[in-house]
């Protein structure tokens, strides 16, 4: 996976979903600590893992974790791990579900602080997924409000100055499509801090490239696009390149690249 990512670009920030620790069923009996593997294979990068699931194994002898990861060679100013809503879907059909999380990492980009958010939303329940999408947008708006109206600070304490910014990138496996209500909620207009689908910034109204079910049809008959980059109003002019590798089969999702100038 990392080799494929590096073939796409000499990246500064890497966002990964479905990263696990001690789930041999998921890792196919390979090295069980995937965040450690990423750190080992990316010298010069800092690796931050957000566990949506952190539980004791069934045998009671070790911990199991599952979540998202951000690796970057840029200076990292702050890291937050935010649990997303987990509402009861209230449906007759009983489906699997789990807690979801959004990692919010602020890095120092060449032009200033940049908030990078990565997540993996609910797959089965549209009710849960929509609530989580709204929460991701709200996190962005909350960060922008703090930048617009900074709090009083106290040096040398947890209240010390923070790298406040309105520049936001939100990416990940959203498990919704471009014509969904969830996508509409993500890009709902805001007076000053609207989010935009980065693909459409370069390609107008063209359909987003398929990123899921191209080669593995376990979860449906047709390929769909559900892995997006959203950028803030303040950042949309920096969108320079967007690419999807639709040739690789290293994952059931295709890797997506965003380049900012």
Feature map (PLM): residue ranges:
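Active-site regions of metal-assisted phosphoester/phosphodiester hydrolases
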Residues: 1-13, 46, 54-56, 60-261
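Short, flexible/disordered intra-domain loops and linkers
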Residues: 21-33, 57-60
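Short, conserved active-site loops that position catalytic residues or coordinate cofactors/metal ions
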Residues: 9-23
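Preference for well-ordered, secondary-structure-rich cores of eukaryotic proteins
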Residues: 31-37, 41, 50-51, 134-135
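Short linear capping/connector segments at secondary-structure termini
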Residues: 19, 52-54
């Amino acid at each position: 996976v990392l080799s494929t990512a590096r073939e796409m670009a000499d990246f500064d920030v890497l966002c990964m979903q479905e990263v696990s620790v001690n789930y041999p069923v998921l890792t196919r009996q390979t090295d069980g600590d995937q965040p450690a593997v990423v750190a080992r294979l990316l010298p010069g990068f800092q690796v931050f893992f957000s566990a949506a699931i952190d539980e004791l194994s069934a045998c009671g002898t070790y911990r199991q974790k599952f979540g998202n990861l951000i690796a970057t060679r840029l200076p990292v100013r702050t890291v937050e791990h935010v649990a997303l809503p987990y509402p009861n879907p209230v449906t007759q059909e009983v489906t699997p579900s789990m807690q979801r999380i959004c990692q919010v990492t602020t890095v120092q980009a060449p032009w200033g602080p940049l908030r990078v958010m990565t997540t993996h939303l609910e797959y089965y329940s549209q009710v849960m997924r929509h609530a989580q999408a709204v929460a991701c947008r709200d996190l962005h708006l909350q960060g922008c409000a703090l930048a617009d109206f900074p709090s009083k600070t106290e040096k040398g304490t947890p209240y010390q100055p923070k790298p406040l910014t309105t520049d936001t990138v939100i990416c990940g496996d959203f498990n919704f499509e471009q014509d969904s209500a969830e996508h509409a909620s993500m890009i709902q207009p805001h007076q000053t801090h609207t989010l935009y689908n980065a693909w459409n910034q370069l390609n107008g109204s063209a359909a987003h490239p398929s990123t899921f079910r191209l080669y593995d049809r376990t979860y449906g008959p047709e390929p769909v696009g559900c892995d997006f980059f959203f950028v803030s109003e303040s950042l949309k002019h920096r969108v320079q390149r967007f690419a999807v590798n639709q040739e690789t089969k290293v994952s059931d999702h295709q890797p997506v690249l965003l380049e900012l100038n």
